[in-house]
Curated annotation (Swiss-Prot):
PANTHER family: 60S RIBOSOMAL PROTEIN L10
Coiled coil: none
Protein name per Swiss-Prot or TrEMBL: Large ribosomal subunit protein uL16
Pfam families: Ribosomal_L16 (PF00252)
NCBIfam families the record matches: PRK04199.1-1, PRK04199.1-4
Annotated organism of origin: Thermofilum pendens (strain DSM 2475 / Hrk 5)
Gene name, Swiss-Prot/TrEMBL: rpl10e
One Gene Ontology cellular component annotation held by this UniProt entry: ribosome
Domain of life from the UniProt record: Archaea
Signal peptide: none
CDD domains: Ribosomal_L16_L10e
One GO process term, biological-process aspect: translation
A GO term, aspect molecular function: structural constituent of ribosome
High-level lineage: Archaea, Thermoproteota, Thermoprotei, Thermofilales, Thermofilaceae
Family label: Belongs to the universal ribosomal protein uL16 family.
Length: 168
């Protein structure tokens, strides 16, 4: 089955579902690398992608944002001239009570009886003001880093903004 739209999982009203010892089918984490670029570089500017509202960000949205920002920064700045970090981890397991949509489906399924759902993916729960992505660059590459984070923000289902700070 295809993925549901991101708006189905954007908000949360239930406790986090994270206890992996009780979950039979554990969905994989889709993000292979959380740190990209040059982690040992001495950069003087830090740019942060901060979410404005609380919500959930699915792992595939985080991965899409990471790939988009990394590809842009690698092409424009170079692999050794930036450090990119995905600052949140998708701990929360998403569940879905799969329903059939065809003629005669009411005889085949139980509706809301035993509707706990099966695991379909992962999401990171974030609060308002929390950092989602972090980019460290030199002062001459600030514009490229801003553009990379702007493109990454378009992949995230929550409103966000970019904060520029001097590194310490």
């Amino acid at each position: 089955m295809p993925l549901r739209p991101g708006r189905c999982y954007r908000h949360f009203g239930t406790p986090p579902y994270t206890r992996l010892e009780y979950i039979k089918s554990n969905p994989p984490v889709l993000i292979p690398k959380f740190d990209l670029g040059n982690p040992k570089g001495n950069f003087n500017t830090v740019l942060k992608l901060v979410v404005m509202r609380p919500g959930q960000i699915r792992a595939n949205a985080l991965e899409a944002a990471r790939q988009h920002a990394n590809k842009y920064l690698t092409a424009k700045v170079g692999e050794a001239n930036f450090f990119l970090r995905v600052a949140v981890f998708p701990h929360h397991i998403l569940r879905e009570n799969k329903m059939m949509a065809m003629a005669g489906a009411d005889r085949l399924q139980d509706g809301m009886r035993l509707s706990f759902g099966t695991p379909v993916g992962r999401a990171a729960r974030v609060e308002a003001g929390q950092i989602v992505m972090l980019v460290k660059v030199d002062a001459k590459n600030i514009d490229h880093a801003k553009e990379a984070l702007r493109r990454a923000a378009s992949k995230i289902p929550l409103p966000s903004r970019i904060i520029v700070e001097q590194a310490q």
